[in-house]
Amino acid sequence: MRKTSLVTILFAMLITFLSACKSDSEEGGTTGKPYDPNQPIKLTSFYPENGGMATKVIINGENFGTDLSQIKVFYNEKQAAVVRSIGTKIYVITPRQPGDNCTITVEVGKDKASFEQQFSYKTQVTVSTITGTPRTEVNAVDGTLAAAQFGLTHFVCVDREKNIFVCERSSYRLRQINEQQNMVTTLATNITAPFIPMVETEGQKVFLPLWVQGGNLLQFDPETQWAKKQVKPQNVTLDQYISAAVNPEDKLVYIKALNGNLAKMDPKSKEAELVTTGLDAGWTYDAICCFDSLDPDMLYICYRSKHCIYRYELSTGNYVLYAGAREDPGYEDGKRLNARFNFPSQICFDLNGIMYIADSSNHCIRSIDREGAVSTVIGVPGRAGYVDGTPDDALFDEPWGVAVDEEGTIYIADTKNKCIRKLAIQ
């Protein structure tokens, strides 16, 4: 009833807003007075006082003018879409995730004013299933999203065209999902020891490291219809590749080997050089690498079987424990070094520098913010299952893989459910 009442109020406000536009047009031939640069803009109120992404808000005040090219509205640092202005009212759309408590600022020309009262942003988190049938016995069916079936879905990545790539590690396959085309396709089968797929910085080529003697990378390129091609870094000898990550600044692919060596490779020429040695040589074959999206000098390595995450600084060679405790599994949110994980697997960063972790044996997705606080995004710690919905309801069964696209949508390889899930945080 409360939600219905709010919708009714907002609808009434919108009708009032449009009526004001119409009345003003009938009286003066324009939709409001133009902005007067010799007078200050004034803010009086806004409504509603809280909401989530795409909430429609009306800002009341004076001297806004009607030229939308001169009007900007910000929720903290995030710019809102301005739909209409009649000089005394501005109609805006709330942007995605501007922060929990938002200062609304209006800029008109060179004039600027901010409300003292803050807008309370309500984050909405939901998970849905893109494709796959939970716990199916059939594990290799291509076709539509509804018809497709998978083996154990271990790792995932996504390109700029929103193609989703899924490594079925124990079934030795790489699959491609295209939501827009409603299609799942197998790109390669009988792959020896495939690990975590990654997309290079141009958002096109996909590289798949192989954990084999001598090491290998498989390359999949849309310009060759995703045909599989075997490539090796030149001038560097690595053994048993276990993970690769692209650096957002130098655009090079960094490859970690089981023997602890770290090399960097030009994805075009394949020229490579050794970066360092001794990064926990032979410690574990499940080491998943990812660069910080805001600080490309920092490479993070998640050691699944050791239940912790390390950080390697390229410029100094400093290598330290970043989150969790070595060989101490468990579940605890809080400060990163006090937090506990249980077989954390794939990690990724969104464009805001938030790290997401597929905490597989805790059956949930965790995050680490820029202040180092660990929290549970979705899933019930210690409880396996399959349920779509909100954080209070959603269940996973050992999710190993997580990836995020440029819009902040998170893709989850829900391993034992044999599904690919989508997490929307708005």
Where would I find each of the regions flagged by the language model?
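Gly/Pro-rich loop segments of beta-rich domains
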Residues: 59, 123-154, 181-195, 223-240, ...
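Conserved beta-propeller blade signature
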Residues: 163-166, 205-209, 252-256, 298-301, ...
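Short loop/turn segments immediately following the C-termini of beta-strands
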Residues: 109, 161, 169-170, 209-213, ...
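Blade-level signature of beta-propeller repeat domains, shared across WD40, Kelch, NHL, RCC1
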Residues: 397-426
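Ser/Thr/Pro-rich low-complexity tracts
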Residues: 22-129, 159-165, 175
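Residue-level detector of Asp-centered blade-edge/turn motifs that repeat once per structural unit
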Residues: 158-161, 200-203, 246-250, 292-296, ...
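A short loop-to-beta-strand structural motif that recurs across blades of beta-propeller domains
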Residues: 172-176, 215-219, 260-264, 307-311, ...
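C-terminal motif of bacterial Sec signal peptides marking the signal peptidase cleavage site
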Residues: 17-20
